[in-house]
Amino acid sequence: MLQKDMYKFAAASENEPIVFGSAQPGYGDEQVNQWIEFMQSQDIKRVCCLLTEFQLIRYSNLLEGYRQGFGIDRVCWAPIQDFNFVKPHVLMHQILPCLAAADQSQEKVVVHCSGGVGRTGHILAAWLVAGRGFSNNAAIAAVKQTGKNPYEAVIAAPFKGRNPWRSAAALNTLLTASKPSLSEAIDHSSF
């Protein structure tokens, strides 16, 4: 299996030059180093990690490994619970500024959760809406074409005791809210 497939590495959309998505590295130090080396071979300069503190426990120190591999000011940690959407304030004040800074610097950034599908997918869709001017539906469709699924939390909603229609509406609201925030995110970016 190619590393690209193993990590589910793909651009946010077919023509996206800066923002990419991926699965997490394996748990051993050697696997983390291989993941970092692979990302660097793809010219990735920044990382946005969506893993929760609980998910980081299995690593010796993943975020520190990223800081050593990419630089202390090139790592964004914005934890999102699995099968959930990002909190709007985290999207607007942490994640979008991270992605906007990468875009301004023309430095490729990879966003990752554990499987590289759901949490990563809806963040990539938010970027396409906020940073590239896509409509919500076009962003979701573009991300789905890359093998990610922004709707994963919607699909999982009944299993989590949530209404899937409300979850779908929440995703739409989140994407819509990300549109005007990008210029503000760029202005306030410290990433």
Q: Where are the regions that the model predicts?
A:
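Cys-dependent protein tyrosine phosphatase-like superfamily
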Residues: 1-110, 115, 122-191
